[in-house]
Each structure stands twice: as structure tokens, then as C-alpha cells.
Design a protein with these regions (language model features):
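Generic beta-strand hydrophobic packing signal
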Residues: 42, 89, 136, 167, ...
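Terminal hydrophobic membrane-targeting helix
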Residues: 30-129
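Solvent-exposed beta-strand sheet faces enriched in polar/charged residues
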Residues: 45, 92, 168-170, 219
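Soluble non-cytosolic domains of exported or imported proteins
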Residues: 50-54, 66-74, 140-148, 191-196
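Short secondary-structure junctions
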Residues: 82-87, 156-163, 209-211
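Extracytoplasmic segments of membrane-associated envelope/inner-membrane machinery
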Residues: 99-188
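N-terminal positively charged amphipathic segments used for targeting/anchoring
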Residues: 1-38, 49-50, 54, 64, ...
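Solvent-exposed, polar/charged alpha-helical surfaces in well-ordered, non-transmembrane soluble domains
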Residues: 54, 58, 74, 78, ...
Length: 230
């Protein structure tokens, strides 16, 4: 072996590579454990409208303490997303001693039963809110569908001049609407067919003058039933 230059060169290269790897691992371990690189600043880079800065600071302080290189970025992000009104959070290291946090807040679109809110993406979330919002009621998992349908209902009902304040989707997939003026509209389960019926009803109701209805049933294929106010 000792008189074989090729083997000697190969062995030397292997030893050099092993030494470099060991040094790299040692340096990495030192960087992770060293107190020379503390996180000094945790900065929220986005303006906040609903998120409590106090709650967010408490989360960030707990997960961001310690070494710049060892900061638990994924855990910090996941914890920040548990703070009320936070939809998404992203965290990045900024050399030499800063963590930058970007927050995307939920935008409340409706109330969901008595349990929470629905955002503009049709996602349910829990957060306090005193805003005047429409009420959605439906089976778990139907939030996005109700949000999508709500926009169509609002457009169709606009000529009536009364806001749509409640949308109910039953467990059997039956739809029911209520306007701010008290008018209740039953669409039934075939909501696609009911779209045309709702349009026809709105046109007829707008022409009816002084007639004021309490309840409208649109489940009939060739017409609708109306209960008027006495």
C-alpha cells in the first residue's frame, strides 16, 4: 500500500474529507449552542388590526428565546397561528440577531352560529368580535359553500333593498334565508334550480307594490307560496 501512490492519495483524500466533516459538525454544534449569537430583536413586520400585540409578544418571547441559529422557527410560526385573528404567520431569520414575523389576519365575513366567525375565504375561526355581521348556520365543513352562495344570494336579492342577515343550511342540505326586514325565504335542497325561482320571485315582489310578505316558499317548480303580513 505504502508504495502505491493512487491508494495513498485516496486515503489522504478520505482523511481530509473526514476531518472537514468533523470540523463542520463541530462548528455547527458550537453555533447552535453558543451564547455569542442571541436573538435580540423579534419584529412583527406587518400592521395589526385585530391581533393582540400583547398575546403575540408572549408567544414570540417564549419560542424565540435563545440562540439565533437554534431558534425554533416552525414551532414559533405554529404557535403564532394559534393567537386569535391570526390566519397565517411566517418567520424568517435576519442576520445577525433578528427574527422577522409576518402576520396575515383573518377578515371576518360572517358569524358562525354561536361558536365563532367565518372569514372571506370561507374558513371558520374563533375570535371575539362585536361587528354587525350576517349569521351563517350549517353543518361542520359547509362554511366555504355558504360563503360562496351568500354572495350570489346578496346579488339576486339586492332589488328588495333589505340586507341578507341570515343563511341557514340544514343537515339535509335545505337552504333558508332571512332578510333584515324579517322576510324569510325557503329555497329547499335544489339550490341551483332555486336560483332561477329566487330571481323570478324578486322580480314579482318588486312589482307587488304594497304587498309585504313574512314567509316565501320557493320549493315549488312552477311558482311559490307567500304568507303575507296581516
Amino acid at each position: 500500500m505504502w508504495d502505491n501512490p493512487r491508494l495513498l492519495n485516496g486515503a489522504a483524500g478520505f482523511l481530509v474529507g473526514l476531518t472537514v466533516l468533523a470540523c463542520t459538525l463541530a462548528a455547527g454544534n458550537w453555533l447552535l449552542r453558543s451564547s455569542l449569537f442571541p436573538v435580540r430583536v423579534v419584529e412583527v413586520s406587518t400592521p395589526l388590526e385585530h391581533v393582540s400585540r400583547q398575546d403575540l409578544r408572549a408567544v414570540l418571547a417564549h419560542y424565540a428565546a435563545g440562540n439565533f441559529f437554534a431558534a425554533r422557527i416552525d414551532e414559533l410560526r405554529a404557535a403564532a397561528e394559534q393567537v386569535p385573528w391570526v390566519r397565517r404567520a411566517s418567520v424568517r431569520r435576519v442576520w445577525p440577531d433578528r427574527l422577522e414575523v409576518a402576520i396575515e389576519e383573518h377578515v371576518a365575513f360572517a358569524r358562525w352560529g354561536s361558536e365563532g366567525l367565518v372569514n372571506t375565504q370561507g374558513e371558520r375561526f374563533a375570535a371575539p368580535s362585536g361587528a354587525a355581521l350576517p349569521l351563517f348556520i350549517g353543518p361542520p365543513g359547509s362554511e366555504a359553500e355558504i360563503t360562496r352562495r351568500y354572495a350570489r344570494f346578496v346579488e339576486t336579492l339586492a332589488p328588495l333593498g333589505s340586507p341578507l342577515e341570515r343563511v341557514v343550511l340544514s343537515a339535509r342540505h335545505g337552504w333558508q334565508l332571512r332578510l333584515a326586514n324579517g322576510l324569510q325565504i325557503t329555497l329547499g335542497r335544489d339550490v341551483d334550480a332555486a336560483d332561477d325561482r329566487l330571481t323570478r320571485f324578486v322580480e314579482a315582489y318588486a312589482r307587488s307594490g304594497n304587498v309585504r310578505a313574512d314567509v316565501v316558499d320557493l320549493r315549488y317548480p312552477n311558482g311559490f307560496a307567500v304568507r303575507t303580513r296581516g
